[in-house]
């Protein structure tokens, strides 16, 4: 497994810092925990930004951090990321906030230290754009949504 050095700053000066941890040796995502002063109740349909208390510095622009929902929270309670996937750019230095939506039918309570999302580090390619008169032909062409599943 490849690794990178990620510098972390703990933005909560009133609490002891907690470094993110991988749940298992083969885990791709590191768990992010809620950093709360009190319990937070998320009502059905409500979107909230949950603080983690962490800010990171990625080693270079060729790496991005991506925040994903935790599968258990999504499948058991309907707790999903409000923006689908969170993207943390290499030049962002603010606190990592996790925007979640309760898509379930019951209120969901988040406590300090609860694992609320997972963060994965991935290579990032910067596009160099240029204008073309036309694009190369392919077998798929302009077929969009569901076009490859139709016979």
UniProtKB/Swiss-Prot annotation:
Binding, substrate: 70-72, 83, 87-89
Name of the gene encoding the protein in the UniProt record: dut
Pfam families: dUTPase
Keywords: Hydrolase, Magnesium, Metal-binding, Nucleotide metabolism
Catalytically driven reaction(s): dUTP + H2O = dUMP + diphosphate + H(+)
UniProt cross-references to InterPro entries, sorted A to Z: dUTPase, dUTPase-like, dUTPase-like_sf, dUTPase_trimeric
Protein name, entry field: Deoxyuridine 5'-triphosphate nucleotidohydrolase
Residue runs in coiled coils: none
Biochemical pathway: Pyrimidine metabolism; dUMP biosynthesis; dUMP from dCTP (dUTP route): step 2/2
Catalytic activity, EC: 3.6.1.23
Homology family: Belongs to the dUTPase family.
Top-level enzyme category: hydrolase
Disulphide-bonded residues: none
Xref: PANTHER family: DEOXYURIDINE 5'-TRIPHOSPHATE NUCLEOTIDOHYDROLASE (PTHR11241:SF0)
Domain of life: Bacteria
Organism: Desulfitobacterium hafniense (strain Y51)
One GO MF term: magnesium ion binding
